[in-house]
Amino acid sequence: ISITVNRFYKNPKYQSFKSNIHIFIDDKLANGTWPTTYIDNILEINPDCKIILNADWYYLEIFSKYRNEKNIFWIKLNLISSFFDNFKTDLTKIVSMGGGVVECAISLSIFLGSKNLNILGVEGNGISRLMCNQDSHFDGEDGDYDNHNSLMFANDMISSARSIRQWHRISHLLDKRNINIYNLTKEGILDAYEYKSFDIATK
């Protein structure tokens, strides 16, 4: 099973494997920062891909055309506690997430029966790179942040800090469940999960 998220479908490498599942839960898709044509683009490139959307968006007018789309699934989300084991992976009820879409993908992978999870392309230092006017994504700088001021970056850092704590929390919870999780990206700060080379993971 391969799961991709957000704008990864724009990566040239996407054409080589075309994921089974793609997830959008970022509010940027609901508030207009990202166009809903992202969904159309994925279905055009990869017609068999199952797309996961946030159930809170179901009745928003901009998503009305997708309500009866057979390859789109709407899921309810629940934040992971840093103190209690409320990590839920039952897709038929509610799926846990932490600071964002990566944690949701982990929950979904476990629900689908995965015991060995590999994460690729998560560095965890995107906000700090943007603050230093450096490229933060595979396609360069993120245009979503062109008009960001210091307060907006401060709020983003709070969200990033929560995500990092959630990665470590998930690592602890998965260890208790005998589920292995690996990081295939050597750059960045994602040290909550053991590093494994991409070549070994794809043998």
Locations of the language-model features?
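Metal-ion/cofactor- or nucleotide/acyl-coenzyme-handling active-site neighborhoods
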Residues: 1-203
